[in-house]
Every structure is written in structure tokens, then in C-alpha cells.
Amino acid sequence: MGKSELSGRLNWQALAGLKASGAEQNLYNVFNAVFEGTKYVLYEKPKHLKNLYAQVVLPDDVIKEIFNPLIDLSTTQWGVSPDFAIENTETHKILFGEIKRQDGWVEGKDPSAGRGNAHERSCKLFTPGLLKAYRTIGGINDEEILPFWVVFEGDITRDPKRVREITFWYDHYQDNYFMWRPNESGEKLVQHFNEKLKKYLD
């Protein structure tokens, strides 16, 4: 097996150490461990999109109607701050990701426990402008997949209403989100990436 092929295999043995340390339910810990010695790298709070909105050129008639402070827009951070990004350092393709932790309606709780809106805030990722930017910057142009991955955590992952809601939103793009349920292993998270998403980075 060649060096390049080896670098494309995830370090599954690293998960054993995480189980022992109790760090297995932290996405950053999990992927930093399994990516060690591979061609994949995890960025925490990546900066690739930090100035995205400042680059928008507005029409003159709009400029005349809004406040225009005397600042250098190139120094601003008017953009998007994903929670993580995964890059294949050979192809330079990038998958941007969000972590949405939210309460939910489960055994012993009232239905009102599912009233949070973290999951709704993730809907901005479906907007035409961000889809285009994520594809351009990340290099994932295959239309059978979206250029982002959302990992849901907490009791929302077992809420009968919210799970149906999210399933409906993603329609035939079910691979673009993962319900990381409480006490579920990091192995399941990595398995989803490995089987459903990694091929779009290769």
C-alpha cells in the first residue's frame, strides 16, 4: 500500500484513547485524533469566510441610502464563522461544518423543552449566496451533496418534532447532517464522515 493511500486512511485506533480519557463526545477531540498522520486536517473556528460580506459590492443607489462609516472593509470580519472545517491537504477541498447543541422534548420533559432555535439558525446555510461561496471556497461542486455538514447534539437529536423537522428540511440531502445522540460514541460520528462525506474531499 502506497504512502498516499495510507494517508487517506483514518486513524481509528486513536478513538480507543479518547474513550479512556472521557473525551470521546467532543467533535474536535475525535477528529483531531483520527486525522493524526493522515492527509486530513480539522480547523477549529476556520477563518476562510471571515470577510465574506465585506466583499459585497452594493449598487450606488443603495450606498446612498445606508450608513457608510469611514472604515477599511478589508479589516472587518463581516462574514461567516463555521464551527469547524475539514480539509484534504492533497486536493485542498474543504467541508465546512456547524455544531448545533440544543435541548429537546424527551422522556421526563415538557414539549416546551424543544423551543430553542439553534437548529433554525443553521438554515442560513441553505441560502443561495452561502451555498455558492461554500462551493467556491471549499471546492465541493458535486450537486448530489451540499458543501456543508451540520452536527446536531443534545436532546434535540431525540425530540420527535425536531427530528422530523430537520429530516424534512434536508430532503434528499440526508448525508449533510448527523444526529450525534447523547452517550453515542465518537466512532459513529467518524463513520458517518468516512462513509458519507469523505469521498467528496478526495
UniProtKB/Swiss-Prot annotation:
The molecule here is called Type II restriction enzyme MunI
Q: Organism's domain of life?
A: Bacteria
Name a biological process GO annotation.
DNA restriction-modification system
UniProt cross-references to CDD domains, sorted A to Z: MunI-like (cd22336)
Task: Write the Enzyme Commission number(s) for this entry.
Answer: 3.1.21.4
GO terms of molecular function: DNA binding; type II site-specific deoxyribonuclease activity
Enzyme class per UniProt = hydrolase
The record's subunit annotation is: Homodimer.
Query: By which gene is this protein encoded?
Result: munIR
Q: Which UniProt keywords apply?
A: Endonuclease, Hydrolase, Nuclease, Restriction system
Instruction: Tell me what reaction this enzyme catalyses.
Output: Endonucleolytic cleavage of DNA to give specific double-stranded fragments with terminal 5'-phosphates
User: Carries keyword Nuclease?
Assistant: yes
Gene source species: Mycoplasma sp
